[in-house]
From Swiss-Prot:
Keywords: Disulfide bond, Glycoprotein, Golgi apparatus, Secreted, Signal. It comes from Mus musculus (Mouse). The keyword Metal-binding does not apply. This is N-acetylglucosamine-1-phosphotransferase subunit gamma. Widely expressed. Highly expressed in the liver, intestine, brain, thymus, testis and ovary. Coiled coil: none annotated. Non-catalytic subunit of the N-acetylglucosamine-1-phosphotransferase complex, an enzyme that catalyzes the formation of mannose 6-phosphate (M6P) markers on high mannose type oligosaccharides in the Golgi apparatus. Binds and presents the high mannose glycans of the acceptor to the catalytic alpha and beta subunits (GNPTAB). Enhances the rate of N-acetylglucosamine-1-phosphate transfer to the oligosaccharides of acid hydrolase acceptors.
Amino acid sequence: MAGRLAGFLMLLGLASQGPAPAYAGKMKVVEEPNTFGLNNPFLPQASRLQPKREPSAVSGPLHLFRLAGKCFSLVESTYKYEFCPFHNVTQHEQTFRWNAYSGILGIWHEWEIINNTFKGMWMTDGDSCHSRSRQSKVELTCGKINRLAHVSEPSTCVYALTFETPLVCHPHSLLVYPTLSEALQQRWDQVEQDLADELITPQGYEKLLRVLFEDAGYLKVPGETHPTQLAGGSKGLGLETLDNCRKAHAELSQEVQRLTSLLQQHGIPHTQPTETTHSQHLGQQLPIGAIAAEHLRSDPGLRGNIL
């Protein structure tokens, strides 16, 4: 009985002292990668990587189209690089810092063509780097599997990537001529014949081929602007090639005819705006000599170089 009473008094004494201090026990520290950076999936979309524009249309050899929609990564040092063919190149810093860097090193722009062969893919208009935008050139080489093999920065804000793929191992896999439409192949044949007949100079030959590659959608016309990236917006009108422009023009013409017919059916009067050509407009303001001088100033120099 005395033992039970002593035990009860001991418990009562401990209870009167209150709970143990919070710091009395040991604290277990769990380290986890932070999610405060730009790749935090819980951040709003506006806080993530924001491209300056839409990528160019997928173009080039048909057997490479299967790479579209896929991405390949490579970790070098503390950075993870990701190459998405026909889309973009990105860089992500692998660190526990709250402000880890993630950025776009370039968006799909055009092919690099040397000796009538596809040599590389240019990714431009990446994130700002000092007074310019980052850009990358991706070289395609033969390999057993699809993989991003190497990344370097040969000059400030300009990156060089090597992508290995079995899709380019055949010696003719990157030739430009077989990828062209029959009409463009005939144009190329004529250019070759004109060069052989000395009707054009080598400089004119190169210019004509560049125009041909631009019409095929492999190269961009100098000064051509890309559709900008708009949140929730469309991806542009798809006027990357001459054929697409012609198709869009035909569709617009049909729409105009349909609307005109609709107005006529309902007896609604309409007038067709008069058109004034550029030459007529100049003729009203400038003498003939000035028109000729203006034409020479605006001449791109192609004819003078190829004859």
